[in-house]
Amino acid sequence: MKVLYIQSGYGGIYSYFDRWAEECFQNTHTEYMIADKPEAESLMKIEAFQPDFTLMMVGDRVPHDWLTWLKGKDIPVYVWLTEDPFYMDISLQVIKLADAILTIEQNAALYYQELGYQNVYYVPIPVNHRLFKKMGTEHSYHSNLLIIGYPYPNRVQLMKEAVHLPFTVRVIGKEWGKYLPKKVLKQPHIDVVSTWVPPEQAVHYYNGADIVINAHRPYHFAFNQNTMRIKNASFNNRTFDIAACEAFQLTDLPAAHPFSSIISYHGMNDFKEKAAFYINHPEERQKAAAANYKETVPAFTFDELPAKLKAIHLALS
């Protein structure tokens, strides 16, 4: 199996996804080639390489140049829709030129199948379990409640409620300082880190938290491009990162196969009750976290990605 991997071209966490994808091909001795932009020299090398298929992550923009060239050369295209369902409007443009559709959202997969597309696969963004793992951390990383990520409205509301609980709360992510009231920011038990933290730091925060709050991006967020308003029912990649650390998480999506051990909350009162319960019952946190780990590692690690791609390739051959 010869894989052409087109780098996403995005910054932030996507630069890590690109690196981890390349590492997983190396670790599994998969024959691969990496390309960035469709420039003349790269295109010549691709033709000489003769890939069996192309894998490309697609988020909030359509890679027209790549899709046009690849189709013109009859190189099968596997699009990995890593922002479903939030940019479904973009995805619906891209899948018209795809030979296989890989999506991180099971509801999106069902929708594509309803439209008549056949080669549709649920493939969540896996975890780099060599980085995200259980480890001891300095006391400065400890918190009772931790949330990492962009301040979506549901997360902001959650934090406004969490500050009234008798626990230390740490919030990490760009722009949080803009969305939380000043009286919240001044609370001594609240620590707001208004910057993006790379995975190498995030792993320490996960390991240092009693509870990681994993509230998902809303499907109807104002800046989404999801005209069909497809709801997200699948866990985000942060779920697997936290689980691989054997850290305890509370999430707002209901547990479902293949992640039946995830602990969910349903509404604000349930969140506060479960936060209090699990803070005071560390043995229950450890039990749930261990179950989360077993459901995630090794099944949803980057090392397993080449085997999943090979299975798809064989099914389409």
Swiss-Prot record:
<dbReference type="InterPro" id="IPR024542">
    <property type="entry name" value="DUF3880"/>
</dbReference>
<protein>
    <recommendedName>
        <fullName>Spore protein CgeB</fullName>
    </recommendedName>
</protein>
<dbReference type="Pfam" id="PF12996">
    <property type="entry name" value="DUF3880"/>
</dbReference>
<dbReference type="InterPro" id="IPR055259">
    <property type="entry name" value="YkvP/CgeB_Glyco_trans-like"/>
</dbReference>
<dbReference type="Pfam" id="PF13524">
    <property type="entry name" value="Glyco_trans_1_2"/>
</dbReference>
<comment type="function">
    <text>May be involved in maturation of the outermost layer of the spore. May act as a glycosyltransferase that contributes to the glycosylation state of the spore.</text>
</comment>
